[in-house]
Amino acid sequence: MKPIYVPKGKAKEYGDYAINIYTGCPHRCYYCFAPNVLRRDKEKFHSCIQPRDGIVEATRTQIERENINNKLIHLCFTCDPYPRGYDSTPTREIIKIIKESGNHVQILTKNGVDASRDFDLLNENDWFGITYAGYARDEFLESPFSEPHADSPYGRLTALLSAHNKGINTWVSAEPVLNAYDVIDCIEFADYVDLWKIGKLNYHPSDIDWKRFGKMAEIALKAKGTQYYIKESLRAEMDGERKEATL
């Protein structure tokens, strides 16, 4: 098994290398694409979560054999590196291997509480990121309706602030955007975010005016002087004809 791979398609917009550590994810986000990509039964994907067999040693072996060095490796695409309610020791061990071999990690999670336990392994060459789709006020302190078993938005942002205070690069994946107004508010007030990556909701209905939202988000990001990347599908909406919808 070669767990480290080069992402293809839309995933290439996130990084040059990636590892998917677990066989599933318990967070049950309604927009999750992973079961379809992996051709897995959706219920089994969300209920049968374990580290892929031998993945820790396979990661070490691949890095040594292929002399992978000074690369940014993304954790993860088809799972969360910190599945809430499960042991994330394999993630910690893989981060150790990546760092000891002279590489760097880019983490994306919806579980800030567990992820913060590994901040002692990260430094100024690494990136810690959370998914922030935009949420209603009554969802801020608990698992959102759209991500029923994930950490609360508050927990994620708190972890992001902690990472920032420790000198770790921070980023937010606002993809998919579910609440446009809240995402823009977060852009304006979260001064501890070093990079935003923003994309639209795909394969599900939405009444968001993507052209208007994209332009408003870009204006806010430029005003803050924050690094950002607009995903291709959202950029296409911004550059195309306006669709009848509401922000």
Give the ranges of each region predicted by the language model.
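Conserved AdoMet/S-adenosylmethionine-binding subsite of the radical SAM
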Residues: 54-223
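Surface-exposed, active-site-proximal loop segments in enzymatic domains
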Residues: 41, 141-144, 244-246
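N-terminal [4Fe-4S]-dependent radical SAM core
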Residues: 1-72, 80
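C-terminal accessory extensions appended to soluble enzyme cores
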Residues: 208-247
